[in-house]
Amino acid sequence: MFDLKATIGRLAQGQTLGRQDAWMLFEQMAFGHASHAQLGALLMALRVRGETVEEIVGAALAMRARMVPVKAPADAVDIVGTGGDNAGTYNISTCAAFIVAGAGVPVAKHGNRALSSKSGAADVLSALGVNLDQTPADIERCIAEAGIGFMFAPTHHPALKQLMPVRVDLATRTIFNLLGPLLNPAGVRHHLIGVYSRAWVEPLAHALGDLGSERALVVHGSDGLDEITTVGPTFVSMLARGRVRSFEITPEMVGLVRANPAELKGADGKWNAVALRRVLEGQPGAYRDIALFNAAGGLIAAGVVENWPDAMALARASVDGGAALATLNRLVEASQPEGHVQPY
């Protein structure tokens, strides 16, 4: 029988857990067998000592076994960040997701409301008019009709609901920042994942491989962003054909001018929604450049192109031809309940 108190003691002493022990620990958490005090102690013990790949893989397997699944095409991609970079940018990966979907790649996006920032994916999508109260069948219809669907994390991970107050009270990064991108309810095997620390770029790529992903880019900007950045170099680890290779990319490599960090700042969900829509409408500037760069990464992760110039060209065509904006409008419409009349 799994001993939760003994495991807390082991973690408090700085010991690491194997994959099986991590799986059992997070299964206990998922079944609600840990008090809020125990949850806080576990999360902070892992945070202070530093999580391991084995712990993350074990935890992900436990959480995946309890999630509410969604069916998506085999070539679907997710574009998501861990959060926790404290950069306060606008919703870059959400904007990039519409560009990728506009380029013809199905997107099954998984996300949440803001925990450590002003605007999470759910906040900006809600402000754009997307209905978040959807069943798995509703989301599957959105992917079929609009080319993109959004899975609101609390709906698909009921086991995590009791953790939400603890995470909010802690108000700091925990293992769940790293786990979130690995818990896509559609089981996507293609990913662009931004992480809050360079130290996690390569380990998370290996974790994805251990979890069965086929192709992924894990990225961290040299300016601290959990995105592909236009401020400077981006550190990348790419999973493909069962192997991980690491490299750097820069804005200049794809014909972009470096941005000032202040040019990428955002605000709350409503403000960011306006900014995102303007990018999809074709407005030039730093917001557009970084969205295109991340969309290019998403297209490479999806496997539709192999090099960055071709990926950038495809991303630009998605925006400039109107497909990305049309994708947003279709998602807003497709996500509404039957009988709803969308205002214009």
Swiss-Prot record:
Homodimer. GO terms for cellular component: cytosol. Anthranilate 2 binds at residue 167. Binds 2 magnesium ions per monomer. Transmembrane segments: none annotated. Pfam families: Glycos_trans_3N (PF02885), Glycos_transf_3 (PF00591). Mg(2+) 1 binds at residues 93, 227. It comes from Ralstonia nicotianae (strain ATCC BAA-1114 / GMI1000) (Ralstonia solanacearum). Its cofactor is Mg(2+). One of its GO terms (molecular function) is magnesium ion binding. Anthranilate 1 binds at residues 81, 112. This is Anthranilate phosphoribosyltransferase 2. Gene3D superfamilies: Nucleoside phosphorylase/phosphoribosyltransferase catalytic domain, Transferase, Pyrimidine Nucleoside Phosphorylase, Chain C. PANTHER family: ANTHRANILATE PHOSPHORIBOSYLTRANSFERASE. The gene is trpD2. Belongs to the anthranilate phosphoribosyltransferase family. It catalyses: N-(5-phospho-beta-D-ribosyl)anthranilate + diphosphate = 5-phospho-alpha-D-ribose 1-diphosphate + anthranilate. InterPro entries: Anthranilate_Pribosyl_Tfrase (IPR005940), Glycosyl_Trfase_fam3 (IPR000312), Glycosyl_Trfase_fam3_N_dom (IPR017459), Glycosyl_Trfase_fam3_N_dom_sf (IPR036320), Nuc_phospho_transferase (IPR035902). Catalyzes the transfer of the phosphoribosyl group of 5-phosphorylribose-1-pyrophosphate (PRPP) to anthranilate to yield N-(5'-phosphoribosyl)-anthranilate (PRA). 5-phospho-alpha-D-ribose 1-diphosphate binds at residues 81, 84-85, 89, 91-94, 109-117, 121. NCBIfam families: trpD. Mg(2+) 2 binds at residues 226-227. GO terms for biological process: L-tryptophan biosynthetic process. It is an enzyme of class 2 (transferase). Keywords: Amino-acid biosynthesis, Aromatic amino acid biosynthesis, Glycosyltransferase, Magnesium, Metal-binding, Plasmid, Transferase, Tryptophan biosynthesis. The lineage of its organism: Bacteria, Pseudomonadati, Pseudomonadota, Betaproteobacteria, Burkholderiales.
